């Protein structure tokens, strides 16, 4: 079905049969419409609209296979296909150019193309001015040159020198940056690739961003004037839009805040689509440059090609599908573009504990953030979604769980709401790692949704035993600290099996031992006014006081007077994992009241357990968004690394390799940039792992074996192991027999005063 010379067509037709009939009719169709095809088909590589009748022209080789590409299931079903591959360059480099606005970026496209790049993409400010980008790409955004729009220009070569040489002229433009590091290139491309999800919901657009006019294309030399006129058309209809796309090929991706909630909004949508079609045709372009026409744009094809060529499309389809059974109503004889718009969702919006300020306070809007991108189904890279990577079950992916919440709120498939066992079972293996919060382009936050669900699911009925054994660990720890020897004897001795069964703990788990003394017992308040408040969390205070003591030494080495809260306080971190939100709220209110003077004074708070810092930076402001004290405490709470970097602390030197296992909550909420910078200043060769590892015993073993344990084995016994999270250190100890250090211990151990 490839290129077919005229003589070969004659032979096929003479042979008869169904193939001969098809080729005869295709050639006859081509001959009748050849003049119109040559006259009206846009001359650009990104023309996806209509059928590829131009591939039947003699000068195109009568290529039947190409003529069928992009028919969108209306003519045939492909069973297999052969494709021609081109060798990829061995080395790539990236030049990024910043512009005042997206039109200025588009104006540069023809000149940039003269440098013969292998890729030229563009994006506007909406792709970087959103919560997902700020959370996930903090370090990457700092690499971008100043501007409100950017061109990303890729060059390739067989060697690094060859690729750099090809990029050199463009990289010399004022304000341009040359990115040679493959890792940094990947991170910049990820910002662009996240466009479809990051622009689907952005309050700066004025509403949700929708497809519809999302992949139009024009010749690259006409791209800028087309974009300028499209912006004017959008403004006339009161629409906002976010732009990105394949600028080097004149293909523009757009997310537009169409109003589908009212009859007037839908009428405006239709008018815009018709006028936008006329606009793109006037510039010699195509309604679709990538995604196809379907029903949404099929009705508009006569405006692009004229009625005669649409008749030719109809005849082309009839050759393959005389009964019109293949995807009817699409492309040919298309249903009206506004005939089958899904009505606004009528989802239940029950009262909730969290505020969901980014979703107008609506749980239904929060859980319907998912647009199906499926990044949670990746097999490697990042921390999302560890349970799915083990089970490979869609219901254990962030996307699958979001869909179950949708079904729960819709009430047709999942009918028992908060009491649903299907939803609870799907959430059971969720680690509440918050990985999706930072890595899902749509900003799905399954850890929060899980806490919300469990809060309601267990209202008025007993919770599973682990909820009481581990969720209430701050209270058990305070009791055990009075007689730690007795407590450890019970937990490590003959009665440990009974205690594990009572607490719902796997028999192969080891229960961590309480320290012989607490950190608070031995802490000496500073002389003089304190300059920093150290947060002695439950795990550090009762299990590892030596970490807090090391932190005090480091902070004093940095010139600070260290205080701690006057009362024993706990942020309630374990409570969220079990949905015990009423108790968690009470804990946070106690903290806000107890720390009122320190909060008012702006005293920095340094946390040592990443998940506790994450509570202050995330859950606190989600539960109390209108509380000024909550907002201030959130903004003045730091990890140890963040605080030391912010203060300009010069750490002591320490050489060697360091394997750093970042707590999943830290990676999701605070990031690891400060840790990387501080350890790098020390002279350590840092490898930051991208992995999760805790939760249900069997699942946690499988998750740990994916990245964490192989990395530790490969590092060798001489490498430093760093893990600030209590659960992370315990998992490493129990699975490898090695002790991972807290950052405070590493810095204090290298400090001159520590060895004095």
Briefly describe each language-model feature range.
Residues 92-97, 147-157, 204-218, 252-262, ...:
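Short, hydrophobic beta-strand segments
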Residues 61-86, 245-251, 255, 287-288, ...:
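Conserved phosphate/anionic-ligand binding catalytic regions in large, soluble enzymes, centered on
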Residues 64, 129-144, 186-195, 253-268, ...:
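Short glycine/threonine-rich loop-to-helix capping motif typified by GTGT followed
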Residues 2-15, 81-88, 106-109, 113-207, ...:
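Terminal amphipathic helices with adjacent charged low-complexity linkers/tails
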Residues 321, 328, 446-756:
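Iron-sulfur cluster-binding electron-transfer modules in prokaryotic oxidoreductases
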Residues 282-286, 294-429, 434, 448-462, ...:
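Ferredoxin-type iron-sulfur electron-transfer modules and their immediate structural context
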Residues 64, 71-92, 142-148, 360-361, ...:
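Flexible, low-complexity linker/loop segments at domain and module junctions
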Residues 1-103, 326-327, 332-333, 337-359:
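FAD-binding subdomain of flavoenzyme oxidoreductases
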